[in-house]
C-alpha cells in the first residue's frame, strides 16, 4: 500500500452512492473513469479505496443528504429531487441546509410532474384547489403549492404513488416521470412540471481543510475533464486557407480551429473539439466545403 493511500481513516475522502437503483451503475462508471478503484467489504456496504484514499459507501438514496449533513460523508451522488426535497424539509423545520450541489452529472434525468387521470379535462392549476395530491415529495410540493397560492391536501406516500387515484386515496399525483410509460400504464397523464432533475454531486458547503481538501480538488478537476468532454469528439482534417471560413461556419458547436504546422502538402492541418454529434451527413457537408482527410476521434479525458 502506498504512503498516500495509508492516510488516517478520517483523512480519507468518503463518497456515498445509491446501493441499488437507476443511479448506481452510472455513478460507479463515472467514479471509475475518474481513476478510483475499491476493495469491497463483506457486507458490501463499504468499499475501501485502493487507487486513492477515497472510500465508497453504498446506501439508500434518501440517506445520502443526511449523511453529508452529518459529516459522515464528504460527497454524495444523488438525484437533485432527493437533495431538494430534504433541503426544503430542513428549511420548513428551521434547520440549516449545510450541503450544496457541486456538479450536475448529466445522467438520471427525469421530471417531477403533476399527473391527473386521463379522463380529466385539464385546463389550468385552479383545478387543483381542494384536491388530494399523492406524492413522495411533500416538501417540494408544499413549496410549489404555496408559491401558486393553491390550497390542496397532500397525501404523503413512500412508494407506488401512481396507484393512489385508482385506490381512491388521492385525486392526482406528483411523481417523477422519465419516459411516461408508468403513467400511461396507470391511466394518468402529466399536466404540470414542478422541476427537472438529474444526478448531481453534492457536498458540504463548508469544505474540508485537512488532507481531504486536496483529494476533493483533484477529484473535481478529473470529473470536470470528463463532463466537459461529454458528447465531444476531436475533429481533424486538411484544408486550404481559403476554405477555412466556410468550414468554421459549419462548426458552430466547435472550439476555434487550431492550425498545426504545415506538412508540406500545400494544405493546412486543422483540428478542433466538437461539442455535439458529428454525423455522416455533417462530415459530407464539411467535405463538400473543402475539408480533406476527415477524422473523428473519441476523447476520453482531459485536464484543462
UniProtKB/Swiss-Prot annotation:
Q: Does the keyword field hold Cytoplasm?
A: yes
Gene Ontology BP terms: L-histidine biosynthetic process
What does the record give as cofactor?
Mg(2+)
Superkingdom as given in the UniProt entry: Bacteria
The record's section on HAMAP family has:
HisG_Long
> Its function?
Catalyzes the condensation of ATP and 5-phosphoribose 1-diphosphate to form N'-(5'-phosphoribosyl)-ATP (PR-ATP). Has a crucial role in the pathway because the rate of histidine biosynthesis seems to be controlled primarily by regulation of HisG enzymatic activity.
Q: What's this protein's family per the entry?
A: Belongs to the ATP phosphoribosyltransferase family. Long subfamily.
The entry's protein name is ATP phosphoribosyltransferase
The species is: Xylella fastidiosa (strain 9a5c)
The taxonomic lineage of its organism, from the top, reads:
Bacteria, Pseudomonadati, Pseudomonadota, Gammaproteobacteria, Lysobacterales
Task: Tell me the gene name.
Answer: hisG
Amino acid at each position: 500500500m502506498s504512503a498516500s493511500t495509508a492516510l488516517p481513516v478520517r483523512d480519507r475522502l468518503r463518497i456515498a452512492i445509491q446501493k441499488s437503483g437507476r443511479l448506481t451503475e452510472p455513478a460507479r462508471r463515472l467514479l471509475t473513469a475518474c481513476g478510483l478503484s475499491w476493495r469491497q467489504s463483506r457486507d458490501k456496504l463499504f468499499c475501501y479505496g485502493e487507487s486513492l484514499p477515497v472510500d465508497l459507501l453504498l446506501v439508500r438514496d434518501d440517506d445520502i443528504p443526511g449523511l453529508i449533513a452529518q459529516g459522515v460523508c464528504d460527497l454524495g451522488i444523488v438525484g437533485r429531487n432527493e437533495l431538494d426535497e430534504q433541503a426544503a424539509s430542513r428549511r420548513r423545520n428551521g434547520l440549516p441546509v449545510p450541503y450544496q450541489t457541486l456538479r450536475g452529472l448529466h445522467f438520471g434525468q427525469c421530471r417531477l410532474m403533476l399527473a391527473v387521470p386521463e379522463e380529466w379535462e385539464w385546463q389550468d392549476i385552479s383545478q387543483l384547489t381542494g384536491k388530494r395530491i399523492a406524492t413522495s415529495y411533500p416538501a417540494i410540493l408544499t413549496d410549489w403549492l404555496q408559491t401558486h397560492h393553491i390550497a390542496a391536501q397532500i397525501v404523503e406516500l413512500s412508494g407506488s404513488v401512481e396507484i393512489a387515484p385508482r385506490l381512491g386515496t388521492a385525486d392526482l399525483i406528483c411523481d417523477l416521470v422519465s419516459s411516461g410509460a408508468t403513467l400511461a400504464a396507470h391511466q394518468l397523464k402529466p399536466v404540470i412540471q414542478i422541476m427537472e432533475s438529474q444526478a448531481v454531486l453534492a457536498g458540504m458547503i463548508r469544505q474540508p481543510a485537512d488532507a481531504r481538501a486536496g483529494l476533493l480538488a483533484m477529484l473535481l478537476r478529473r470529473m470536470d475533464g470528463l463532463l466537459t468532454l461529454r458528447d465531444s469528439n476531436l475533429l481533424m482534417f486538411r484544408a486550404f486557407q481559403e476554405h477555412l471560413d466556410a468550414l468554421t461556419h459549419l462548426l458552430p458547436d466547435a472550439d476555434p480551429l487550431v492550425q498545426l504546422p504545415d506538412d508540406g502538402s500545400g494544405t493546412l492541418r486543422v483540428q478542433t473539439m466538437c461539442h455535439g454529434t458529428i454525423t455522416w451527413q455533417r462530415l459530407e457537408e464539411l467535405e463538400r466545403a473543402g475539408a480533406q482527410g476527415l477524422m473523428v476521434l473519441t476523447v476520453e479525458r482531459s485536464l484543462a
